[in-house]
Amino acid sequence: QSTPYLVLSTVYTPPPSSCDDTQQMTERSRLRLEQMLPEIDSFRQAKILTQEEATQMIERRRFLEERLDDSEGAPEKYYMEYADHFSACNKLIRKRKRKTGTKCQKGDIGLRSATLHLWARYVRAFRHRPEAWMKYCDYLSSRNMHHKLQQTLAKALALHPRVSTLWLRAASTELRLSGEVSRARGVFQSGLRVNPSDPTILLGAIKLELDFADGMRPSLEGQGVDNPSLRLIVDGGLAHMVLSHGLGAMRDQTEVRGLMGGLVSVAGEFSEVPFAQTVLSQGEGLEAWLVGMRQGRLAELEAERQRAAKEKAEENEEASSTEEEEEEE
């Protein structure tokens, strides 16, 4: 049986070993363990952990650290097992602190820092996988690290702008944290600029507007306000506009069909909103209704294009005429 290789002090001293250099801890692993010592030692001094528990904790972390460094492209499983270890430590320490009434701010900060560092290493290693970013977001959300969560979502979207689930997560996070529909709306607008016909993002944006309309309706009707602009919003006008623009970006009727099931489902959640009622009332004629809306939007876009081209031609003609007059002078 091997002797404990680490004494709870501010200095890490590796045990004697007959292993060659490739089997010993890397300098990075050793440094990380040294950085964790103050955290674990503070819990021991506060009598939240016993000496034996603290030593076992360090031994476990050494094993987990070495395994990550020894593996070329360590599998995700190794990172998740390390994260589970930190989670178990956190639960144990919180339970002991509640039981004893003891506080240990230094240890808490150290444990949180070590956990965040591990997650940062994880998303660096698996940055090409959107699922890895979602797992990190789940962790940050569970710890109420709101600012860090927003920063992480921004980084994830910069790497994976085509992943619709990340846009949905970012929009729901903004709405939950700020309580402002405009913030979530801005996220969806950014997502649709990059993915103009993505059905998941489009349905998320429509659902946001229907929810907004449904929330405003009781207040508006209760106050008896007769404002055409507000009435348009309450009737689902913004949701109608989002749908129209999304349909205009779709390449063909196949994409329109792919939207139908989700649209009916979303409309069913807000059946009191007039626009949702219109969607639901289409029945088997929904596809034809959507195709007609798409054609109308395409006609609007063509009219806008022609108008812009005409204005540009007039500007060029005016500029050319001005140049000729200057030359004559």
Feature locations, PLM:
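Polyampholytic low-complexity alpha-helical segments
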Residues: T3-E329
